[in-house]
Amino acid sequence: MKLVLTDQIPSGKNAMGVRRDGRHYPKARFESWRSQASFEIMKQKVKLPLTQHMKLPLLGDLTVTISYRTFDNTLRDVPGMLDALWHLLTHTQIIENDGQIKGVAWIYPWRTEGPCVEIEIVQG
């Protein structure tokens, strides 16, 4: 399964707050990004063949390859961005649990055009 996101990924670390009653909630910056990214994923899910759409959320062990292009040359917190992506994929019901992800390849491509993030998820 391949997915594309057009915006930069914020760090997922410290993206969630805890209320006094113990409930967790997303902080404003992360929630804004997650809403936009979720909308992009939902538009892509609608175009999936019915057989592939019925297999969501993906189950079992997964391997993920991420091609990430930055708009600028600033340093990025890759583990934090991975956290944000795992939260997003779980939130949009692409995957059931981030514990399923057994392998990750993070690639900084030479491309200067196109989307910021290209995600390929492979089962098995």
What feature does the model see in each segment?
Residues M1-G124:
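Acidic, proline/glycine-enriched N-terminal capping motif
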